Swiss-Prot record:
Similarity field: Belongs to the UbiD family.
Name of the protein this chain belongs to: 3-octaprenyl-4-hydroxybenzoate carboxy-lyase
Organism: Aeromonas hydrophila subsp. hydrophila (strain ATCC 7966 / DSM 30187 / BCRC 13018 / CCUG 14551 / JCM 1027 / KCTC 2358 / NCIMB 9240 / NCTC 8049)
Gene3D superfamilies: Single helix bin, UbiD C-terminal domain-like
The protein's annotated pathway: Cofactor biosynthesis; ubiquinone biosynthesis
HAMAP family in the cross-refs: UbiD
Pfam families found in the cross-reference section: UbiD, UbiD_C, UbiD_N
């Protein structure tokens, strides 16, 4: 099912028992986090806090708190169907013309979906029902969560940051956390390789000293939100991909203060600029690693205009030790990554990012091994193929008889098919998430590859063990007798 806006999605969730309204007064300071965390860990519903302490604006959390709700938001019936989204992305990343009528018919659904990718620009929109500017801009009107006791200030977590660089026609949408430091100021925490940071860097090169226009949208429709966290090709706007997911063109409206386009159905829109050279210390904050991060400097976002619906809803989340909402997103988006990797490496059978590993710091890959050294080629490919895996510290490669998603299977392969000296690959001085305080230098560390495959001639001179497998005829005979034996009661 497709959803025209966030409210349509909320209504469908409520109808199916996947949204809980909380009318009791709950404090955005710590209390919402504790309730949301307990609910998410229990696989519970999305939460709509209707009476935040000190505010009149309701707060929506845990929207994507289960993998199935992520799939729903992407217009798919279940998590397994997200493989289709990965197939679309692999085609968009490297499109190939059909080689005949049969292949044309096979690709026709993709071609039809591509027609929904251009945006539809409106002259007016719900997100601009109220317009505040200048002194009237006041972030204190928004019940921004203060998630953890050691957090330095309230934190905007689900803002879709919209930018455009000087050399690209497409707009970039990214989700970067933003620390509140004043009534009209936030700190824009983005890493150097992210689209918004690249746009800002190129802007400063092309327009030195000039202010960089930025818009942050809160509470967009689910396809647009999830498009911003999906690994779309660099040449494609997340708006275009959202249209493909939704099956209808993304409706946008021109921002009040600049030429950037904002989601027409968004609940709240913050418009403003980054002043070159204006930086501020960000953090510490409790993060998806389960620790408080170090303080570092990032650009300051000055808000000149705040537009919103008349009865706006604030969409929020928290991050902490997995499972949290980003970890749940990681579980669902894992299915999107598989077809992308398989197009480049057809020998890959499965690919798994364990949520316990922060959903990106460790990967388990199973392959149909074809030659000596094959596992090392795959691990190097994983690190270099998609930007999303540049911070993956550990890659474990196993044969296709191993279930990548079963730790008992994976550990058995590691302990029976690996020699630590021969089968471990260490690479130093590689990009590492700056939040990873275990690395010796901020932003620079090492990677480890583990070849847990069966070894071929050339990789070992020893006779290799054969796995124990029961005789199939005996298994079938005992299957027929099992209930009669009544061993387990």
């Amino acid at each position: 099912m497709k959803y025209k806006d966030l409210r349509d999605f909320i209504a469908q969730l409520e109808q199916s028992g996947q949204l809980k309204r909380i009318s009791r007064e709950i404090d955005p300071y710590l209390e919402m986090t504790e309730i949301s965390d307990r609910t998410l860990r229990a696989g519970g519903p999305a939460l709509l806090f209707e009476n935040p302490k000190g505010y009149t604006m309701p707060v929506l959390t845990n929207l994507f708190g289960t993998p199935d709700r992520v799939a729903m938001g992407m217009g798919q019936p279940n998590v397994a169907a997200l493989r289709q989204v990965g197939i679309w992305l692999s085609y968009l990343k490297e499109p190939e013309p059909p080689r005949g009528f049969k292949e044309l018919m096979e690709k026709l659904p993709i071609f039809k979906q591509v027609l929904n990718m251009p945006t539809k620009r409106l002259s007016s929109a719900p997100c601009q029902q109220r317009v505040l500017e200048g002194e009237a801009v006041d972030l204190d009107q928004i019940p921004i969560q203060h998630c953890w006791p050691g957090d330095v200030a309230p934190l905007v977590t689900w803002g879709l940051t919209i930018t455009r660089g000087p050399y690209k026609k497409r707009q970039n949408l990214g989700i970067y956390r933003q620390q509140k430091i004043g009534k009209n100021k936030l700190i824009m925490r983005w890493l150097d390789h992210r689209g918004g940071a690249i746009d800002f860097r190129e802007w400063q090169e092309a327009h030195p000293g000039e202010r960089f226009p930025v818009v942050v949208a809160l509470g967009a429709d689910p396809a647009t939100i999830l498009g911003a966290v999906t690994p779309v090709p660099d040449t494609l706007s997340e708006y275009a991909f959202a249209g493909l997911l939704r099956g209808s063109r993304t409706e946008v409206v021109k921002a009040v203060s600049c030429d950037l386009e904002v989601p027409a159905s968004a609940e709240i829109v913050l418009e403003g600029y980054l002043e070159p050279g204006e930086m501020a210390p960000e953090g510490p904050y409790g993060d998806h690693t389960g620790y408080y991060n170090e303080v570092d400097e990032f650009p300051v976002f000055t808000i000149t205009h705040m537009t919103m619906r008349k009865d706006a809803i604030y969409h929020s989340t928290y991050t902490g030790r997995p499972p949290d909402e980003p970890a749940v997103l990681g579980v669902a988006l894992n299915e999107v990554f598989v077809p992308l990797l398989q197009k480049q490496f057809p020998e890959i059978v499965d690919f798994y990012l364990p949520p316990e590993g922060c959903s990106y710091r460790m990967a388990v890959v199973t392959i149909k091994k074809r030659y000596p050294g094959h596992a090392k080629r795959v691990m190097l490919g994983v690190w270099s193929f998609l930007r999303q895996f540049m911070y993956t510290k550990f890659v474990i490669v196993c044969d296709d008889d191993i279930n990548a998603r079963d730790w008992k299977d994976v550990i058995w392969a590691i302990t029976t098919r690996m020699d630590p000296a021969r089968d471990t690959t260490l690479i130093e001085h590689t990009p590492i998430d700056y939040l990873d305080f275990a690395s010796p230098v901020s932003g620079l560390g090492s990677k480890m590859g583990l070849d847990a495959t069966n070894k071929w001639p050339g990789e070992t001179n020893r006779e290799w063990g054969q796995p124990i497998v029961q005789d199939e005829a005996v298994k079938q005979k005992i299957d027929a007798l099992w209930d009669e034996l009544n061993i387990l009661g």
